[in-house]
Regions:
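Active-site cores that bind ATP or allylic diphosphates and position pyrophosphate for catalysis
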Residues: 1-22, 26-233
Length: 233
């Protein structure tokens, strides 16, 4: 069904974005960046938010709540709003929202780090995707004491050393954050020595649980409102 959908769209490349989280703007930017790279290369490329809908850890946001966030992003054409590179889309002749789609994937999360990143690539290849976003700490979870099991970019490196016939291409994305100098989110590797605006994930959750919207430089109000309502129940 997904393969048929991609064919119907007539995309030359189809980029999948794997996630188990509601998207704050830095998360969202990984998909924006990935499809902009392909579009700038001259491809008519689709950007598919492809969240896992199966079993997760107990402290992860439930799938039903996350889907409300994702649907809001999709239906209100919010992807990349304020963060996309307008020059790329002007040259292409279409907008990022015109090639943005939402398709859930009903598999569980194993929190297996780099090996699971490869598994996620295999799944997406089987579904007809040509590319997959591989971010920092992909499929990551720490030890019980909070210490890291894997390095931030181990999932990037594993794709460099694969043997066999995995044809899907990893779109490797690093840290992203909001920069006042740009007035938008960008990759931190482009801003050496510049401090981004940031809030810890713990602080964001505390604000949402208290019924407060996090700073819109971190999370879109539309996403915040869905999560605030969910925490009230």
């Amino acid at each position: 069904m997904t393969r048929a959908f991609i064919r119907e769209k007539k995309w030359e490349r189809a980029l999948a974005f794997q996630t188990r989280n509601p998207l704050h703007r830095a998360h969202e930017y990984a998909l924006v960046y990935g499809v902009e790279v392909l579009t700038a290369q001259g491809f008519y490329a689709g950007a598919v938010l492809n969240p896992l809908m199966g079993e997760l850890k107990g402290d992860d946001v439930p799938a039903a709540t996350r889907m409300l966030c994702y649907r809001k992003l999709h239906s209100e054409r919010l992807l990349g709003q304020g963060d996309k590179d307008e020059s790329i889309w002007k040259k292409a002749g279409w907008d990022i929202s015109d090639v943005f789609e939402l398709i859930g994937l009903d598999i569980k999360m194993f929190y297996g780090g780099p090996s699971e990143a490869v598994m996620h690539g295999i799944y997406r290849q089987n579904y007809g995707f040509s590319d997959i976003v591989i971010g920092r700490k992909h499929a990551d979870a720490p030890f019980e004491d909070g210490k890291a099991i894997w390095g931030d970019f181990d999932a990037h490196e594993i794709f460099d050393n694969l043997k066999g016939e995995l044809h899907i291409q990893p779109c490797k994305v690093g840290f992203a954050a909001f920069y006042e100098s740009l007035g938008r989110v960008d990759l931190t590797e482009r801003h050496e020595g510049e401090k981004p605006y940031s809030i810890s994930g713990t602080k964001v959750r505390e604000q949402l649980q208290a019924g407060e919207r996090p700073d819109p430089r971190i999370m879109r109000p539309e996403t915040s409102d869905v999560l605030i309502e969910a925490y009230r129940k």
